């Protein structure tokens, strides 16, 4: 990493020039933690908040919001997105982008940030808002606990038990399994499940679930295989939904540095670069291509 003072000076120059492409390039070079150090260095050097100066320099829109998010406390950004998705609106897509696309470490910090910002415990506030009548709500509560323990049986035995749960529509078992299985054990269980049933766990969801119940578990499947795989799926959803800039802001702003391999996982759906350029306008697309390092 170059000297912090030089990076801060480069950022100030880009802001003064209203050069959002250069701001995006600088952001793309560093992790979320490093970007926070840059924001602190900017504060120390100029006595101003970096996101505020980005806001003053640029011309609004999701592009401005995304670049501001990249130099803000990501845990506070996630907490705010969750709060915005609640408030009686229950934006299910936002829950996939913020609750499931999140590492356990980041979730712990987000919970603390939410309480600090809104004076309420996050999980309790979430469940109060969405209720407990639907399967996806109960699954989300288990997922947000981030309590995973090694499975007792072999992959083949666990696959047998899971298949039995599907045949009996045992929603509690299925949701507890998905919320509690360690990621490092999930892949082998999924492989055994395929050998046993002829389909993957993700395909089995479609046999008994629809709507948000289905998509919550489907997203969890990808998250357990690797956050970059979930990011690829969510980016594809955002592209297919008429270029959903709000979703791309959430996915990119909070997780791009942890999910850069998404562009490789995306090959299942096609070319991430081609889809981004096709689905987003001439202002947003180059920023997204820079941040995701889509150069092929």
From Swiss-Prot:
A GO term (biological process) for this protein? cytoskeleton organization
| Record's function text | Giardins are involved in parasite attachment to the intestinal mucosa and in the cytoskeletal disassembly and reassembly that marks the transition from infectious trophozoite to transmissible cyst. They may interact with other cytoskeletal proteins such as microtubules in the microribbons or crossbridges, to maintain the integrity of the ventral disk.
Q: Which Pfam families match?
A: Annexin, ANXE1_4th
Protein name, as recorded: Giardin subunit alpha-2
* Gene3D superfamilies given in the database record: Annexin
Q: Please state where this protein is localized.
A: Cytoplasm, Cytoskeleton
Q: Does the keyword Ribonucleoprotein apply?
A: no
Q: Which domain of life is it from?
A: Eukaryota
Q: Which InterPro entries has this protein been placed in? A: Alpha_giardin, Annexin_repeat, Annexin_sf
Its GO CC terms? cytoplasm; microtubule; plasma membrane
Task: Write down the PANTHER family for this protein, in alphabetical order.
Answer: ANNEXIN, ANNEXIN B11
Looking up SMART domains in the UniProt record yields: ANX
Q: Which UniProt keywords apply?
A: Annexin, Cytoplasm, Cytoskeleton, Microtubule, Repeat
Q: Its Gene Ontology molecular function terms?
A: calcium ion binding; calcium-dependent phospholipid binding; phosphatidylserine binding
Sequence ranges of the Annexin repeats: 2-71, 73-143, 153-223, 226-293
Answer whether the UniProt record assigns the keyword Ribosomal protein to this protein.
Answer: no
Q: Which family does it belong to?
A: Belongs to the annexin family. Giardin subunit alpha subfamily.
